[in-house]
């Protein structure tokens, strides 16, 4: 009996070690001068922390946003479950914002017509020279269309990474295919044209800080933004 117990303990310990070796942990935080998302202005200077776990293509992550200068800025907590195999990726995100259908901003309130949660599914493919993503809201606090019905608000985005002068660049174009007040569109509309540059600043031999700048234009709303930010991570 004692030998069996020791064998089971040894097996569990070896399994734990193996799992720890294969599980990837992400801990980071962005500081941004302006919270711009898919061409929309969602807040002023903000802290945006990330905590995630990944295992063989499967990942679970939490992402948040809190305003640092304006108390009226909406707080946000998003949970994403995704799977990547080769260039293909699929995922589901639960967005929660403090401002929504529930005036009390309760997190654990999921009633269809009084929740601050929004659920979105996505599918995409990374071709190497460019990536393509499609997102659709399927439940929760979604927008409405011209017929005052659930819009199943969707967003399509193409991103092209490239390197120039030892700096990592990404050019992005995003569009909303259907009418929805969630994105403020009356039909197909280009809502996001952005260019981001990122460069890591070396602090010590083992620590550097990625700094990024991004210019974004929203042709639909006729707005433009310039954002500066940096990322902290172990």
Regions found by a protein language model. Give the residues of each.
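Cleavable N-terminal export/targeting peptides
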Residues: 1-24
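Short loop/turn motifs that connect adjacent beta-strands in outer-membrane beta-barrel proteins
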Residues: 19-24, 91, 161-170, 198-211
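Outer-membrane beta-barrel initiation region
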Residues: 20-53
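Residues that define the transmembrane beta-barrel architecture of outer-membrane proteins
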Residues: 23-25, 43-47, 73-77, 115-119, ...
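Transmembrane beta-strand segments that form the barrel wall of outer-membrane beta-barrel proteins
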Residues: 28-35, 58-68, 90-98, 105-107, ...
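Detector for outer-membrane/organellar transmembrane beta-barrel domains
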Residues: 109-180
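Outer-membrane beta-barrel "beta-signal"
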Residues: 160, 195-197, 201, 222-234
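Outer membrane beta-barrel transmembrane domains
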Residues: 168-203
